[in-house]
């Protein structure tokens, strides 16, 4: 481990004064050492604390973790997420403590091997064929056969999956068929699925090809609310970004996530923005969703409680 793990008796640290948003959390007793979590990260930039928070929680619980990215490239943290002077425009305050900035820089350091050689989703999971393919039927049969093999041999070893947020998922996770297939298989296997910030819309678009119905229909979720959206400064970075282009700024996000989640949950579900609350984490099994950066530790903590205490509902 390249950074100090949080102790199980860490004192409450309020988000005011820009301290780490750590709750007075204690791990469940007799936590088994055999849990394994699959963590999905964007190759276009993830928000540092949204990895560090859950990861430190999993480490403290003795969990094993595997990392995966769309093509197997090493993920890179977004620069503002390791800058303690960065002021989040919608919140009007710094959102990165000095301690967190150091932790993010440590795990982002190329000399730190922890994020090296992530699983390549492209190499691991099959691609769904085009309908226009002359061998469509045979290719679809092979596609489903391969998914069944992966489900039986690979996915059975995982207890849960987590999709880390940041602006990067907008580019290569939200509309990624292989990410959708992972989510659907975890869902069908009744395994908890956690997502943070702009990783949450992956849940809205993971739909069975037959009924095409949202799997969060009728569910309660949180995510990046409209009040938290940038008017400018939505940036990306990583191995896919051409260095000759300089800083990439798409202005506002590609879409208002809140509207997508409100529509995807339907009249019997609900999106919870919890504007004005410092932390917003919702558990509606099998989904654990975190709104944004300050919710990172709490998202990991609720997932541990889902796995160890049978938590099925929280925050609504």
Region spans (language model):
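Generic extreme N-terminus detector
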Residues: 5-6, 251
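Glycine- and acidic-residue-rich phosphate-binding/metal-coordinating active-site segment common to enzymes
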Residues: 192-193
